[in-house]
Amino acid sequence: MLELNKRKEEAKVAKEQKVKAIVRTYYVIEGNKVKLKNKKCPRCGSIMAHHLKPNERWSCGKCGYTEFIGASKKR
């Protein structure tokens, strides 16, 4: 019983310590307009991540949609 309570407390502490994304890094202010730095996912509408390695691509962490940039060098 004590072990179960200990696990619950550890899970609660881990949940509280999660790092949230800093939303202000996704936008750029140009004059009086606010622009999004990254692309939006065409499937679900969330902000996509730009990856450079191993292949340059845009990927959505929410739905898994991926756009590859350029031709693949592997054959």
From Swiss-Prot:
Record text on cofactor binding: Binds 1 zinc ion per subunit.
Gene3D superfamilies, A to Z: 6.20.50.180
Keywords recorded for this protein, A-Z: Metal-binding, Ribonucleoprotein, Ribosomal protein, Zinc, Zinc-finger
Keyword Nucleotide-binding among record annotations: no
Residues annotated for Zn(2+) binding in this entry: C41, C44, C60, C63
An example Gene Ontology molecular-function term: zinc ion binding
C4-type ZnF: 41-63
A GO biological-process term: translation
GO CC terms, sorted: ribonucleoprotein complex; ribosome
Domain of life per record: Archaea
Cofactor: Zn(2+)
Record bears the keyword Repeat: no
InterPro entries: Ribosomal_eS31 (IPR002906), Ribosomal_eS31_arc (IPR022845), Ribosomal_zn-bd (IPR011332)
Quaternary structure and interacting proteins, as annotated: Part of the 30S ribosomal subunit.
HAMAP family with a match to the protein in the record: Ribosomal_eS31
Family membership: Belongs to the eukaryotic ribosomal protein eS31 family.
Record protein name field: Small ribosomal subunit protein eS31
Organism: Saccharolobus solfataricus (strain ATCC 35092 / DSM 1617 / JCM 11322 / P2)
